[in-house]
């Protein structure tokens, strides 16, 4: 054994882990690198041991003697806010870390004047990203200078560098962070963890490289979890189905500490609950609550899946009570394209004010309904019920905040052979950034895609950047790369003008080179232009060292809002309790589509995760706070055989917030799936009088439980 550290041994050497999305009046409840004085959840790091190989380290870890005095756990949201609830942080006097408020219009008057008022409580269960690759970190320290190099499976190496510098009190210039190829992130790696501090700290102490790789059990108990919320929703509705007001009291189970992006799910939920609907009056009170569970943070879509689920279940409940067609009720309340842009009167932490930019929500709905032939489904459903089969159709329409700032950087550089290198601050985990960014630059410079190399994920190579999260990479990072390419072309035309001794207005750009208009044989290729730009004394005064490169930082001008409608057709077998997804359809609007195949892949992957959360996945705890979902035998994931065919359509409503009209597409598939699937299950089980107010998981056992407790209806 080479080293042992505890919280006490590093108390004066490291600070707590940061949370960057706290509101000003929040109780910070920051996570210690190693537990200090109190352990607040199973899975919290207590000590670290270092050995020559992982087997010796595992054995040494068994020798660590921990003495704990048991404290009463608090796990449930309602229990956590009770007057006599045990406090996770006594100094705060409460388990509520913060409360987000929104007040739009006159909610009280709308409810007083409403023809109908509907109230429902919706529960969102706890599940998480569970990427194929768990987390890992490797650090080494440069002898003499003490400069740290950290390899980490992170979604934001530049922010990780900033956070590590703050926690260790080391200048950022003394830190290099490299994010190698990462096997999935989905938000779990968009957080900053204890191991990302401990590994470089130990490397510095030992003077040798130190590596840590998380196993699956560690991942399932220690890596941030997601989704768990409870929402008390009330809707004020006119007799014709117009939703006049929504009021919501919301709580998010944030677990035992406020992690890097802990407030974001609650903020997005409360800022976006009304989705694509007008609903002129709105009140939200959204609480972040501390409990003795693993900390909660962002997961693909953050608070959007919860918001879409609650709103779309509420719309179906209203339609059923009014005897209206579900699609027609949606159309009646949807914002039209002529009403955009639309200031919603809310805001989202780290993003800004919610002002819907572009879209055609009713058309998106109609296109999705056509994909699965909604018009004929009622007849199909009656015929199937006569045969003893229970099928249902579900709809979920939503609007999604994408392209979150503050900025992203890109450098575009041409070498003497005409090959192009793009350095981007965005970092991929399988989204296809390399293809997308190369395509944007190649299209602008009119060169072959194979001639463009994209480099990402190294803070020494790319000194400035933000990272990959919040469906921002194409719209922010891609825009930076495209603008960089535009500047390279502008410079190339200046060089060509001098070298060919013509005015710039007499030149045109064609097929990766500058040529004289009307005389295509008089031209310079991109590589020749790069050589001319760097040749000593070859350019007039003021243009010396005029390299054919450009670094561009694209600032987000606002939030670009994507939207979609998901539709699902399911069958529920009352005898076995099995839910089968028969067909699935998505019409997605992410503005200008750069690569349809990649967008489809993102949508399909998100739908798969939505199916997983709705039918299979759940983090379960016992009454003492012990996690019970600690292997993939207990935490179930969807298999290929569980996936339906997914019909995908695209609607393009370019945003005016960047020059190319792009919006984000990375998270949308996961946003609409829970709402569409649960609405479909509820539709299938309507003859049994089943009421669904949770997003899942709808396992066979859960379906049987619901059927036993339900009262059959006359339908």
Locations of regions flagged by a protein language model:
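C-terminal catalytic domains of large/alpha subunits in multi-subunit enzymes
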Residues: 8, 169-174, 204-210, 239, ...
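Conserved catalytic cysteine-centered active-site region
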Residues: 37-38, 171-179, 202-215, 219
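Flexible, low-hydrophobicity surface segments
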Residues: 1-95, 117, 272
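Conserved beta-alpha junction segments in alpha/beta enzyme cores
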Residues: 107-168, 393-425, 431
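Short acidic, glycine/serine/threonine-rich loops at helix termini
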Residues: 14-19, 60-63, 130, 152, ...
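Short glycine-rich loop/turn motifs
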Residues: 36, 133-138, 230, 392, ...
């Amino acid at each position: 054994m080479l080293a042992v550290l505890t919280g006490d041994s590093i108390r004066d050497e490291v600070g707590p882990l940061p949370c960057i999305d706290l509101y000003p009046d929040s109780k910070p409840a920051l996570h210690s690198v190693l537990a200090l004085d109190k352990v607040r959840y199973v899975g919290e790091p207590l000590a670290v041991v270092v050995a020559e190989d992982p087997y010796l380290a595992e054995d040494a870890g068994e020798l660590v003697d921990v003495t704990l005095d048991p404290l009463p756990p608090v796990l449930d949201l309602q229990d956590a806010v009770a007057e006599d609830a045990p406090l996770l942080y006594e100094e705060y006097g409460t388990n509520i870390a913060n409360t987000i408020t929104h007040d739009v219009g006159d909610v009280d008057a709308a409810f007083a004047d409403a023809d109908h008022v509907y109230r429902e409580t919706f529960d969102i269960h706890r599940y998480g990203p569970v990427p194929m690759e768990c987390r890992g970190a490797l650090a080494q320290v440069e002898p003499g200078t003490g400069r740290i190099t950290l390899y980490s499976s992170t979604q934001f190496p530049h922010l990780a560098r900033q956070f590590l510098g703050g926690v260790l009190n080391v200048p950022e210039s003394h830190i290099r962070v490299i994010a190698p190829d990462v096997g999935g992130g989905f938000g779990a790696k968009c957080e900053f963890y204890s191991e990302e501090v401990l590994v470089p700290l130990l490397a510095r102490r030992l003077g040798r490289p130190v590596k840590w790789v998380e196993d699956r059990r560690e991942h399932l108990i220690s890596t941030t979890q997601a989704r768990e919320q409870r929402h008390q929703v009330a809707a004020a509705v006119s007799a014709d189905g117009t939703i006049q007001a929504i009021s919501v009291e919301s709580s998010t189970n944030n677990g035992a500490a406020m992690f890097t992006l802990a407030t974001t799910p609650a903020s997005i939920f409360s800022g976006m609950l009304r989705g694509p609907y007008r609903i002129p009056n709105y009140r939200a009170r959204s609480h972040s609550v501390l409990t003795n569970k693993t900390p909660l943070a962002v997961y693909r879509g953050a608070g959007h899946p919860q918001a879409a689920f609650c709103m779309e279940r509420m719309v179906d409940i209203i339609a059923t009570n009014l005897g209206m067609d579900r699609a027609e009720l949606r159309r009646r309340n949807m914002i039209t394209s002529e009403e955009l842009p639309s200031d919603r009167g809310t805001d989202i932490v780290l993003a800004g004010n919610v002002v819907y930019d572009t879209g055609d929500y009713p058309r998106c709905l109609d296109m999705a309904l056509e994909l699965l032939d909604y018009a004929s489904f009622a007849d199909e459903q009656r015929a199937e019920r006569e045969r003893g089969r229970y099928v249902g159709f579900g709809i979920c329409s939503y609007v999604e905040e994408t392209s979150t700032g503050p900025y992203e950087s890109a450098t575009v550089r041409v070498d003497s052979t005409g090959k192009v290198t793009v350095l981007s601050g965005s970092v991929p985990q399988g989204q296809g950034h390399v293809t997308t960014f190369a395509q944007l630059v190649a299209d602008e410079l009119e060169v072959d895609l194979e001639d463009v190399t994209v480099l990402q994920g190294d803070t020494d190579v790319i000194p400035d950047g933000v990272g990959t999260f919040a469906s921002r990479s194409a719209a922010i990072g891609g825009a930076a790369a495209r603008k960089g390419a535009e500047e390279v072309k502008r410079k190339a035309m200046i060089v060509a003008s001098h070298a060919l001794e013509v005015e710039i207005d007499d030149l045109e750009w064609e097929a990766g080179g500058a040529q004289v208009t009307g005389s295509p044989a008089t031209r310079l290729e991109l590589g020749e232009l790069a050589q001319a730009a760097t040749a000593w004394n070859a350019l007039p005064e003021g243009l010396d060292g005029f390299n054919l490169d450009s670094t561009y930082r694209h600032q987000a001008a606002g939030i670009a809002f994507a939207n979609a409608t998901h539709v699902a057709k399911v069958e529920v077998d009352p005898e076995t309790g099995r839910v089968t997804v028969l067909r699935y359809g998505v019409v997605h609007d992410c503005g200008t589509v750069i690569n349809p195949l990649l967008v489809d892949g993102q949508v399909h992957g998100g739908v798969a995760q939505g199916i997983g959360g709705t039918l299979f996945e759940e983090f379960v705890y016992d009454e003492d706070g012990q996690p019970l979902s600690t292997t993939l035998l207990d935490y179930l994931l969807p298999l290929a055989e569980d996936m339906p065919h997914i019909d995908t359509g695209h609607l393009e409503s370019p945003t005016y917030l960047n020059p190319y009209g792009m919006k984000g597409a990375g998270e949308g598939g996961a946003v609409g799936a829970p709402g569409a699937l649960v609405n479909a299950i509820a539709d299938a089980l309507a003859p049994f009088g089943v009421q669904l107010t949770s997003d899942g998981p709808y396992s066979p056992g859960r379906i049987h439980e619901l059927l036993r407790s339900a009262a059959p209806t006359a339908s």
